[in-house]
């Protein structure tokens, strides 16, 4: 899936997600599920959304949380938000 995000931006997003989920970067893949594999709860999902809005200078509707289940989904949502 093409997101239009460069490698540096993807790395920054990955660092944010890993920091909030309190996991090492090598523990997460683009397709590993935050809730099922990394014990993320809804509060952490909101924290991820807020941090992404702040650092990536985008606005993300909370309805997009259902798509932000893994890094791949986060990349797509951020990419789409950046285009708006």
UniProtKB/Swiss-Prot annotation:
Residues 7-82 form the Carrier domain. The modification O-(pantetheine 4'-phosphoryl)serine is found at residue 42. Keywords: Phosphopantetheine, Phosphoprotein. SUPFAM superfamilies: ACP-like. 4'-phosphopantetheine is transferred from CoA to a specific serine of the apo-ACP-like protein. The keyword Nucleus does not apply. Disulfide bonds: none annotated. The keyword DNA damage does not apply. Acyl carrier protein. This is Polyketide-8 synthase acyl carrier protein 1. It comes from Streptomyces avermitilis (strain ATCC 31267 / DSM 46492 / JCM 5070 / NBRC 14893 / NCIMB 12804 / NRRL 8165 / MA-4680).
């Amino acid at each position: 899936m093409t997101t239009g995000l460069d490698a540096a931006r993807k790395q920054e997003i990955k660092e944010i997600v890993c920091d909030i989920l309190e996991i090492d970067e090598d523990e997460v893949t683009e397709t590993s599920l935050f809730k099922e594999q990394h014990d993320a709860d809804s509060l952490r999902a909101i924290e991820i959304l807020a941090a992404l809005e702040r650092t990536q200078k985008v606005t993300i509707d909370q309805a997009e949380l259902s798509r932000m289940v893994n890094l791949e989904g986060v990349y797509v949502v951020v990419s789409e938000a950046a285009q708006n």
